[in-house]
Amino acid sequence: MDRAIEHTKYLIAGSSHAALEAINAIRMHDAEGPITVVTRDAHLPYSPTVLPYVVSGKSAPERIFLRDDDFFARNKVAYRPKAALKALHADRNTAELADGSSVVYEKLLLATGASPAIPPIPGIDTVSYHVLRTLDDALKLRGAIAESKQAVVLGAGLVGMHAAENLVKAGATVTIVEMSEQLTSGYFDKVAADMIEQAFRDAGGKIMTGSRVVRLEPTAAGAKLTLENGTTLEADLLLVATGVKPEMDYLNGSGVEHAQGILVDDRMQTTAENVWAAATAQARGFFTGTKVMNAILPDATIQGRVAGMAMAGDPGVKDYAGAVPLNTYHFFGRHAISVGSSTVPEGGEVVTRFDEKTGRYLKAIFAADGPLTGIFGVNEFFDGGVMAQLILRRTDLTPLRSRFVANPLAVGREIMSQTWR
């Protein structure tokens, strides 16, 4: 028998940054309207970005939560963990949950996040492997690392690289297998990637770029991997970190249009009435104007705020400015950061500098008329949020270009203090 049907004004599916920012935005304009949050997770809200630090032991699991029960009580929010969204019936404003219950809503925000994308490698369903997307994943991997002697990480994105560093520091022999010709493809350029690769090699890690796994087989110790070139690898710990895919299965038959993500307009509204999306959204890109996925924490927060304000009818809501990529990465005592586009605009200019002694590298890309369009660095110091604002505001840096390239942190903050009031 179906469980009782709940009624709420605002239903939020998901519980991370976008969802929490939407709650804040709604409550700024509507202090009393009932809010219900449903999430597939079993825990209070936390950020997936902190999970590598749970694995390493730098962050205690009990200290990573973004909000506590008091937050939901103060904001009059019904928080329902272990309540995954199963199906959406947008034509009658009803969400069906995996436990058999249903919620009838007036306004719905879809912020359901993503799950690991598992590659279709023959034999992958016959071996044990780890992923890293939830707190439970992190705790499981943390326990396994302590026992591992020979580990293989599939994928050289930021999740895989963080985990590989933890394994190296724990004393395991670690091999990273990556299909692309460089590490951290899509995050950093070739120069930065080579610096990251050298740091891993210096620490004892093994790197195999341009490599594809074509078969997996179980062994007594764990798994045997066969690569396209015939090379074989043995692993007692296998981590699959080959990317994520947005959670959208519940949209089948819902009338909500989706492609790579959930398609939204500049107020984060989907193609269905009374339904918004954030973080899982495919929204307008800043540089191209076409709809793109930008699955990073700062953007999820912005999208959640815009969606929440729009749902509550806040007259102060502004259009989403567009997606600007921003990524930071700490590795073996070093750090790398990338903000904006790596594509050089027509007539644009690229300025680079590299100090071999300090290992500092900077690349800045400018449009023909002066604004910054992208900035990337290793062991460089600049504020990613300030750089993103310089890009979004199309600030002409022509008069300050030499000073800016020499010290983007100081000059960026100088511009901020003088003009952003």
From Swiss-Prot:
Q: Which reaction does it catalyse?
A: phenylglyoxylate + NAD(+) + CoA = benzoyl-CoA + CO2 + NADH
Q: Which Gene3D superfamilies match?
A: FAD/NAD(P)-binding domain (3.50.50.60)
Q: What is its EC number?
A: 1.2.1.58
| Pfam families in alphabetical order | Pyr_redox_2 (PF07992)
Instruction: Kindly list the cofactors needed.
Output: FAD
pH-dependent activity: Optimum pH is 8 when measured with benzyl viologen. Half-maximal activities are obtained at pH 9 and pH 6.8.
Q: Which InterPro entries match?
A: FAD-bd_OxRdtase, FAD/NAD-bd_sf, FAD/NAD-binding_dom, PadH
Q: Name one GO biological process term.
A: L-phenylalanine metabolic process
Positions bound to FAD: 15-18, 39-40, 279-297
Keyword field = FAD, Flavoprotein, NAD, Oxidoreductase
Q: How is its activity regulated?
A: Activated by magnesium ions and thiamine diphosphate.
Ribosomal protein as a keyword of this entry, yes or no, is no
Induction data:
Induced anaerobically by phenylalanine, phenylacetate or phenylglyoxylate.
Q: Which GO terms describe its molecular function?
A: NAD binding; phenylglyoxylate dehydrogenase (acylating) activity
Similarity-based family: Belongs to the FAD-dependent oxidoreductase family.
**Assembly and partners?**
Dimer of heteropentamers composed of an alpha (PadG), a beta (PadI), a gamma (PadE), a delta (PadF) and an epsilon (PadH) subunit.
Q: What does this protein do?
A: Involved in the anaerobic metabolism of phenylalanine and phenylacetate. Catalyzes the oxidative decarboxylation of phenylglyoxylate to benzoyl-CoA and CO(2). It can also react slowly with 2-oxo-3-methylbutanoate and use different electron acceptors such as benzyl viologen, methyl viologen, FAD or FMN, but NAD seems to be the physiological electron acceptor. Also catalyzes an isotope exchange between CO(2) and the carboxyl group which proves partial or complete reversibility of the oxidative decarboxylation reaction.
Under what name is this protein listed? NADH-dependent phenylglyoxylate dehydrogenase subunit epsilon
